[in-house]
Design a protein with these regions (language model features):
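C-terminal and inter-domain tail/linker signature
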Residues: 1-148
Length: 148
């Protein structure tokens, strides 16, 4: 894949994210991840493994933050090097649904969040992510939604 192809793949992946589950673009979000993708979240927890599991956690995220939006047109930063992309964008949303944290369910707070969100993705030659590393201020996010 050339640099421009990777930048377009990343941008349209985030377009699909912004459209959300149930939209005609959601299949793009799913197919941009390999069947055995590893998704690393902030906080050091073991990665989410597999497209299906990542899809399930994404759908749950939309239940908690149904109006979430990643500002990717334009990104704050977007570049490609080798088979990697790196994007930095503003991420916004409102906690309108319950949040599942382990065995706990936290009721919605109705509070909004705004954080910088960074994705470092490793792509295969077929245009799908094999490894995705996500970075954002977890403590700041929790404080903004009234949980910190």
């Amino acid at each position: 894949m050339n640099r421009q192809d990777l930048l377009e793949l990343m941008t349209t992946l985030d377009d699909a994210w912004n459209a959300g589950p149930g939209s005609s673009l959601w299949e793009t979000f799913r197919k941009r991840h390999t069947e055995d993708v590893a998704v690393y979240w902030p906080g050091g927890a073991p990665p989410t493994r597999g497209r299906r599991n990542h899809d399930l956690e994404a759908v749950e995220f939309f239940k908690t933050f149904p109006d979430n939006h990643l500002i990717n047109r334009p990104y704050k930063i977007l570049f490609a090097d080798g088979n990697h992309t790196c994007s930095v964008a503003e991420f916004r949303g409102t906690m309108k649904g319950p949040m599942k944290l382990g065995d706990q369910v936290i009721p919605p707070t109705g509070k909004s969040l705004r954080v910088e969100f960074c994705t470092v993705a490793t792509w295969n030659d077929q245009g799908a992510i094999t490894e995705e590393r996500l970075f954002y201020d977890q403590v700041g996010l929790m404080k903004q939604i009234g949980l910190g």
